[in-house]
Curated annotation (Swiss-Prot):
GO-annotated molecular function: transmembrane transporter activity
Region (Disordered): 1-25, 457-481
Name the record gives this protein: Hippocampus abundant transcript-like protein 1
Segments passing through the bilayer: 50-70, 83-103, 112-132, 135-155, 169-189, 197-217, 256-276, 282-302, 320-340, 342-362, 388-408, 429-449
Location of the protein in the cell: Membrane
Ranges facing Extracellular side: 1-49, 104-111, 156-168, 218-255, 303-319, 363-387, 450-506
Glycosylation (residues): 463
Gene behind this protein: MFSD14B
Organism per entry: Homo sapiens (Human)
CDD domains (UniProt xref): MFS_MFSD14
PROSITE patterns: MFS, SUGAR_TRANSPORT_1
Bias (Polar residues): 459-474
Regions of this protein lying in the Cytoplasmic compartment: 71-82, 133-134, 190-196, 277-281, 341, 409-428
Length: 506
């Protein structure tokens, strides 16, 4: 992906206009560009929540049709192909997230919210037009599938430090809420009217989300934080997907947190990519039961990430809340691995809902251990780790299913049918048990994370620094804008020494 200077910048280089004409031209350009950036009201967490809700509601509608199309397209090695498709998408997201983040720090959040939602939802109508193109576009759409990253930057722009823990929890809960009813609605429409109508409704919802961003969402990044010219230089170090990972070893606390995130999110990413197929193939869930299961877990996750998270953070503390979430994750993965009956899946689903507190708690822990002007780098590291897991996790789970000969040989087996494979196996779900072992290692690593620490020795950005945003004005003291990813030459993570006040998640 290349970033070329806009035509007006090249014209400026060819013939420099008079000095007195520059402010007038610049003001006119800013006035023209500010019209579509205004939206309705002041930027808030509610705008971000609606964008997330609509995007994942559209994809939730396609849960049942997607399982059918996946089986029809890849009748052999279904789990493996699903893992590879999702793995390619995740790796592309990991590679593109820093560039999109750096550009959003320059040009604002709204243009990139619009772009990420559009390209993420672009494959939806292709499901009925051409399944092969649909899966190909899903893989390629990973380049822009970083809506959550831009949303988190948007939320950080509009909240104070002490509000971010709650705000991240609400955004994560909104994601869960979008999956409460959409799979059930999609399953009903599919059974009553066919998959074509489901795809049409999902496409309409995606278009509604795009229109909402275009018309209603205001820009969250203040104009004075953006460069005067849209042709401002961007350091390519900001676009390096491995730049944030290189900072991990510079501080022991950051290293421990990142290892914890990697070991906990790797099995979670794999689980998200294959679990609905697993419920249908191994356990024998039909479309209605899968939709009901998603709704139950979604509702409980909302309660866990809103009410329970706040209570646990106050009573147990940040670190112990993370440990509790990892404990729930371990239990639910082991239960999925050994469970062979439907009731076991329902019981494990309640535990899975409680494990959803882990990522918001980790986000709060990261923010708590970083100074206010280091938030972009600290959260950027976590974003990079999760992006890497989104690529590796699905491929890992697909490979393990393939190694243990778990295939989608029959679509929608009847519950308690003798044809359902692995019902009598000692370990019906090998990838989930493997994931539980990985989370156990994550739990052991998290034990060594200090409860309180604060970064110090921050190296501030100088206006004379080369390769950075030379036209970006200084930050006002009354504003706390958190960039998605910062240039490694701007911020350096130093050793965490002094305890400080608490501040702060698809």
């Amino acid at each position: 992906m290349s970033v070329e200077p806009p035509p007006e910048l090249e014209e400026k280089a060819a013939s420099e206009p008079e000095a007195g004409a520059m402010p007038e031209k610049r003001a006119g350009a800013q006035a023209a560009g500010s019209t579509w950036l205004q939206g309705f009201g002041r930027p808030s967490v509610y705008h971000a929540a609606i964008v997330i809700f609509l995007e994942f509601f559209a994809w939730g509608l396609l849960t049942t049709p997607m399982l059918t199309v996946l089986h029809e397209t890849f009748s052999q090695h279904t789990f493996l192909m699903n893992g590879l498709i999702q793995g390619v998408k995740g790796l592309l997201s990991f590679l593109s997230a820093p560039l999109i983040g750096a550009l959003s720090d320059v040009w604002g959040r709204k243009p990139f919210l619009l772009g990420t939602v559009f390209f993420t939802c672009f494959p939806i109508p292709l499901m009925r037009i051409s399944p092969w193109w649909y899966f190909a576009m899903i893989s390629v759409s990973g380049v822009f599938s970083v809506t959550f990253s831009v949303i988190f930057a948007y939320v950080a722009d509009v909240t104070q430090e002490h509000e971010r823990s709650t705000a991240y929890g609400w955004v994560s809960a909104t994601f869960a809420a979008s999956l409460v009813s959409s799979p059930a609605i999609g399953a009903y429409l599919s059974a009553s009217y066919g998959d074509s109508l489901v795809v049409l409704v999902a496409t309409v919802v995606a278009l509604l989300d795009i229109c909402f961003i275009l018309v209603a969402v205001p820009e969250s990044l203040p104009e004075k934080m953006r460069p005067v010219s849209w042709g401002a230089q961007i350091s390519w170090k900001q676009a390096d997907p491995f730049a944030s990972l290189k900072k991990v070893g510079k501080d022991s606390t950051v290293l421990l947190i990142c290892i914890t995130v990697f070991l906990s999110y790797l099995p979670e990413a794999g689980q998200y990519s294959s679990f609905f197929l697993y419920l249908r193939q191994v356990i024998g869930f039909g479309s209605v039961k899968i939709a009901a299961f998603i709704a139950m877990v979604g509702i409980l996750s909302i309660v866990a990430q809103t009410a329970f998270l706040s209570i646990l953070m106050r009573s147990l503390g940040n670190k112990n809340t993370v440990l509790l979430g990892l404990g729930f994750q371990m239990l639910q993965l082991a239960w999925y691995g050994f469970g062979s009956q439907a009731w076991m899946m329902w019981a494990a689903g309640t535990v899975a809902a409680m494990s959803s507190i882990t990522f918001p708690a980790i986000s709060a822990l990261v923010s708590r251990n970083a100074e206010s002007d280091q938030q972009g780098v600290a959260q950027g590291i976590i974003t990079g780790i999760r992006g890497l897991c989104n690529g590796l996790g699905p491929a890992l789970y697909g490979f393990i299913f393939y190694m243990f000969h778990v295939e989608l040989t029959e679509l929608g087996p009847k519950l308690n049918s003798n044809n359902v494979p692995l019902q009598g196996a000692v370990i019906p779900g090998p990838p989930f048990l493997f994931g539980a072992c990985i989370v156990l290692m994550s739990f052991l690593v998290a034990l060594f994370i200090p409860e309180y620490s604060k970064a110090s020795g921050v190296q501030k950005h100088s206006n004379s620094s080369s390769g950075s945003l030379t036209n970006t004005p200084e930050r006002g003291s009354d504003e706390d804008i958190e960039p998605l990813l910062q240039d490694s030459s701007i911020w350096e993570l130093s050793s965490f020494e002094e305890p400080g006040n608490q501040c702060t998640e698809l």
